[in-house]
């Protein structure tokens, strides 16, 4: 689901930017900021880069379910659905600084307009994803961004961080099947 959510966000942002600036080529890439050897990947040049920087499990469990009723009335016992928040670093990487700022501004506009992506706003949302919410992460300012870029092994670039909320990861494993309880009378067993 993580890959599907990132690919969908990439495609949706890419289409927005292509429409806004009248572009024919793709301008958004989901990729790491720096290769293992410390260089900027070629595919990142003159692109808006989306990279996953953190994953956290959603701790509010009121929407989780463990048992699912089957057509025959019995229940399927599966592991709990788990929901995660993904932290995305969005960094335009253009040779011209003005282009970097232009695409950063347009990216912020995209997430302001599309704070929620679901089937009502996009018919192309992937199967298994019902809703994605995006929340701007203000963090602790300059020092936090400096530390992040240092940890990534890269030079700072103008960028923003968004929290993508509630990506559900569901296990396909079934733990057990359980019979349903049928009550046919109000009598107790002792009667």
Indicate where each model-derived feature is located.
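Small/polar-rich, solvent-exposed N-terminal microdomains that initiate assembly or binding
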Residues: 1-66, 128
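Short glycine/proline-enriched loop/turn "hinge" motifs that connect secondary-structure elements
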Residues: 42-44, 77-82, 152-156
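Active-site-adjacent structural patch at catalytic or cofactor/ligand-binding sites
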Residues: 51-59, 63-93
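Short conserved micro-motifs at the rims of enzyme active sites and ligand-binding pockets
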Residues: 61-63, 172-176
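"Short basic amphipathic alpha-helical interaction patches in structured regions
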Residues: 64-69, 100-108, 122-125
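Short, cationic low-complexity segments
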Residues: 73-79, 177-191
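A generic structural motif
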Residues: 91-98, 168
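Acidic-leaning, charged glycine-interspersed low-complexity segments
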Residues: 102, 112-169
């Amino acid at each position: 689901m993580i890959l599907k959510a990132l690919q969908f966000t990439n495609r949706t942002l890419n289409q927005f930017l292509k429409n806004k600036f009248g572009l024919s080529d793709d301008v958004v890439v989901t990729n790491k900021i720096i290769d293992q050897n410390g260089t900027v990947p070629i595919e990142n040049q003159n692109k808006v880069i989306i990279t996953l920087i953190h994953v956290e499990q959603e701790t509010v469990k009121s929407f989780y379910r463990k048992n699912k009723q089957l057509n025959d009335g019995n229940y399927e016992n599966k592991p709990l659905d788990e929901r995660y928040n993904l932290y995305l670093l969005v960094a335009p990487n253009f040779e011209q600084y003005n282009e970097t700022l232009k695409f950063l501004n347009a990216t912020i506009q995209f997430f302001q307009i599309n704070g929620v992506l679901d089937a009502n706003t996009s018919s192309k949302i992937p199967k298994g994803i019902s809703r994605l919410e995006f929340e701007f992460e203000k963090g602790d300012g300059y020092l936090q961004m400096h530390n992040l870029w240092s940890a990534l092994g890269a030079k700072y670039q103008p960028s923003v961080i968004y929290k993508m909320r509630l990506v559900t990861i569901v296990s396909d494993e079934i733990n057990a099947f359980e019979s349903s309880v049928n009550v046919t009378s109000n009598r107790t067993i002792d009667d």
